[in-house]
Amino acid sequence: MGSYLNPGNEAFAVALNSEIYVDKTGLLTYTNKVMNTLQGYICNSRPRRFGKSITANMLTAYYSKGCSSKEMFSGLEISRAKDFEKHLNQYDVLHWDIQWCMEPAGGPERIVSYISEKTISELKEYYPHILPEEIRSLPEALSRINAASGTKFIVIIDEWDVLIRDEAADLKTQEEYINFLRAMFKGTEPTKYIQLAYLTGILPVKKEKTQSALNNFKDYSMLHAGPIAPYVGFTETEVQKLCEVYGQKFEEVKRWYDGYQIGKYHVYNPNAVVNLMLEGEFQSYWSGTASYEAIVPLINMDFDGLKSAVIEMLSGDHVPVDVTSFQNDTVSFANKDDVLTYLIHLGYLAYDRTFRTAFIPNEEIRQELILATKRKKWNELIVFQKESEQLLKDTIQMNGNAVAKEIEKIHREYTSVIRYNNENSLSSVLSIAYLSSMQYYFKPIREFPAGRGFADFVFIPKPEFQNYYPALVVELKWDKSAVGAIEQIKEKQYGNALKDYQGNLLLAGINYNKKTKKHECVIEAMQK
């Protein structure tokens, strides 16, 4: 058992020994299926604290010849597979954590030589009669071992993208690292000695122009995870089971931590869910793992439409995004879409693959982004926040004239002439206008679908603010009347979103004239 060749199973044992462990060994069924095929080159990228290292350690514990793991996997999903024992601890495994290697290597520029030297040294102990003393190339060493003994290797690289993310300016080091990976994995020769390759990090494989630098790898990411989607984070079913065990309300957990839609799965951040179950408090558990220094420079980049897109998303809207041009690095940003795509990979945004839109996935992330912009004094947002706070105050004080003027201003500034009377624009106007409500209310709910000529939102106060803030039903329409909007809300009996709500309720009907663009507002108080 070596440090890099055939490690033991101790790291995965720590995960299994924890109070909460969610069984993700079903992934091994997939890797067993694709090993020694063209599909056996996998890059699975996901945000921080989404279980990347646990997955890498699980693969090592299952495949490595350096340990005996039958008892460890007994009772887990993989143990019920027909080929469970066929692959159990049967392979020579190479496992590198690039982040960890940085310090003993003596710096990023030494990573490739350090990994090569240390791994070759361990290979010589296993295969002393095959490798000559002077060999320095790791791909050549693996090729020689395969030619002499027929041995094939499983290669697992954790935090594969550290040099791409953290050493963005050091092009020489990056080029050396990419060339090393190419030599390891690309071409005919590597297919002879690679049984399975599994890379994990935050970024997919770096692109060069429009092509992947390792185009034989299949990228599974927060944009598309294909067959491994249920293993990216906690699924809804897994979270529901934890809620039953720990006595948490699932709908509340969903509001706070859901939002990543990957294929047919709703995916939750494992770190947040585990901390909630163990500590019992709904809050953001992201701060300990995220760097504000990384977020704010991104959203402050001088790209047309970027800041307004962030404000729209903070208010609950989805914005269109083209994810195809991003180069999978941290320096080649060409437009706002590249920035938004990177934020998706970081986990600060989610991606709707069907409609090709980006959005803020949940309450936890919304709070983190607002906090980040406040700490760095993002001036555009601060000015807008003040205006939005005044609008909320005027709404609660039932000052219809002031509300009408404020909505009219936002409608004018955030909507083009072409889209002024567009129904989706009305929705954006309402959600943007009431951005400040996010401190006290959950994400607004659109009660009725598009196609009815109006936009309506329901704002439900968070439990801790229900004694201070009423629920709000706000409707915006054109060429009718504000009173008519109020009557329509009443006819709908406030909609399904408020069926379980008990407390103070304000109805705000807003109407504007399409010709004059003059807005009017009527507000009524109700008790429910």
Where are the predicted features?
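Phosphate-binding site recognition
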Residues: 1-422, 437-441, 445
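Structural motif
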Residues: 154, 470-474, 506
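Mg2+/Mn2+-dependent nuclease catalytic core
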Residues: 174-180, 478-495
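Metal-dependent nuclease catalytic cores in nucleic-acid-processing enzymes
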Residues: 184-191, 341-349, 431-436, 488-508
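Feature representing long, continuous alpha-helical segments
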Residues: 424, 428, 432, 455-457, ...
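Conserved catalytic cores of phosphodiester-cleaving nucleases, focusing on short active-site segments
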Residues: 430, 455-461, 469-480, 492
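Catalytic centers of nucleases
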Residues: 444-464
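Domain-level recognition of nuclease-like catalytic cores that cleave nucleotide substrates
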Residues: 497, 501-528
